[in-house]
């Protein structure tokens, strides 16, 4: 429960969402002063924001009784998680980043697109959608820490500008 509340903390401060006692205590125990917290309550920027949501198959985690976490794959999915954020903050949303390695990428794209349309149909103001990235990445699997020259096949196009199946699927979505 604590980690679930903590995932909202930075946005709660940014958007002026009232904190519960556990999160307030967590901030105070970890170095924030009451005066600093008060600054956030008077300087929220919600009125000028669009919420951006990245969603990858690695986003969701299982929290074990001893507190350690592990990647869980897709349990709730983009629709459920984004609905939670929308109902909490009531901001327009852009699905800003998603991908998965080939050959699952075209299917993943269609699933994310369907989630975006379901949210829109349910009244959530969706303002955009992005597949990341336009081209395959090099050494993205190591967050660019290793200069190994590994091509990560995540793009709409390969590094020779040849369209990938996910790129073709993206084009069809845009055409419709």
Predicted regions and their residues:
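Active-site region of glycoside hydrolase catalytic domains
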Residues: 1-107, 114-176
């Amino acid at each position: 429960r604590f980690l679930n509340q903590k995932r909202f903390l930075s946005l709660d401060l940014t958007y002026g969402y009232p904190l519960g006692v556990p999160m307030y205590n967590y901030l105070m125990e970890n170095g924030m002063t009451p005066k600093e917290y008060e600054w956030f309550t008077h300087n929220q920027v919600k009125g000028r924001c669009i919420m951006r949501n990245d969603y990858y198959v690695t986003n969701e985690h299982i929290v074990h009784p001893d507190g350690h976490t592990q990647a869980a794959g897709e349990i709730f999915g983009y629709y459920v998680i984004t609905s939670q954020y929308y109902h909490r903050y009531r901001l327009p949303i852009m699905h800003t980043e998603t991908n998965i390695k080939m050959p699952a990428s075209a299917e993943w794209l269609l699933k994310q697109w369907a989630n975006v349309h379901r949210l829109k149909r349910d009244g959530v103001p969706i303002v955009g959608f992005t597949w990341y990235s336009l081209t395959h990445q090099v050494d993205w699997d190591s967050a660019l820490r290793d200069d190994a020259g590994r091509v990560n096949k995540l793009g709409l196009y390969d590094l020779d500008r040849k369209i990938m199946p996910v790129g073709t699927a993206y084009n069809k979505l845009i055409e419709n």
